[in-house]
């Protein structure tokens, strides 16, 4: 019997204020940050997401990915949001920043997911990306109040803005 991997950990070198998750080819236009994108800490396009990791400079951090049926909050989260993520091409699933990248090895299939993004801090900063399969549209929003201006329930704008 083949074991399907439902979790993955990536030691990612994060730089240029971005962690990207995508299921399509690189597109410079989809990487652009508008004033609202900067304020909310995310650029949201179908199959192409960019998150602000918050800390400045280049640094290494663990990014913990999971595919689950139900989202479970990390008690160490400092920021938490959910955004829609469309897997457009499972063969192009990547996690990256400017200086490093990794293939997403989770068994994500073409279709819609709720992607939960958490910035967590214990002894070190780490990130969690949790994919939950969804049939309905997912409203991008903050899920907790945070020290960078996020307010629980507040909607996040999609696209360049």
Model-based region annotation:
Residues 109-116:
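A glycine-anchored, Pro-Gly-centered beta-turn/N-cap motif
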Residues 96-98, 112, 160-161:
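A general structural signal for short secondary-structure boundary/capping elements
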Residues 45-47, 90, 110:
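Short, solvent-exposed coil/turn segments at beta-strand boundaries
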Residues 73-108:
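Extended, solvent-exposed segments with strong compositional bias
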Residues 1-78, 123-161:
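Primarily secretory-pathway and cell-envelope proteins
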Residues 118-122:
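Short beta-strand-plus-loop segments that form exposed binding edges in beta-rich domains
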């Amino acid at each position: 019997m083949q074991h399907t991997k439902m979790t993955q950990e990536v030691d990612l070198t994060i730089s240029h204020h971005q962690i990207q998750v995508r299921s399509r080819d690189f597109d410079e236009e989809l990487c652009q940050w508008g004033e609202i994108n900067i304020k909310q800490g995310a650029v949201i396009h179908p199959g192409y997401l960019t998150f602000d990791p918050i800390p400045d400079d280049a640094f290494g951090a663990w990014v913990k990915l999971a595919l689950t049926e139900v989202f479970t909050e990390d008690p160490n989260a400092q920021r938490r949001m959910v955004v829609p993520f469309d897997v457009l091409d499972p063969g192009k699933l990547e996690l990256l920043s400017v200086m490093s990248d990794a293939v997403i090895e989770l068994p994500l299939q073409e279709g819609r997911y709720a992607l939960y993004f958490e910035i967590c801090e214990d002894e070190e900063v780490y990130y969690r990306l949790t994919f939950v399969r969804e049939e309905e549209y997912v409203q991008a929003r903050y899920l907790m109040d945070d020290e960078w201006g996020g307010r629980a329930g507040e909607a996040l704008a999609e696209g360049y803005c």
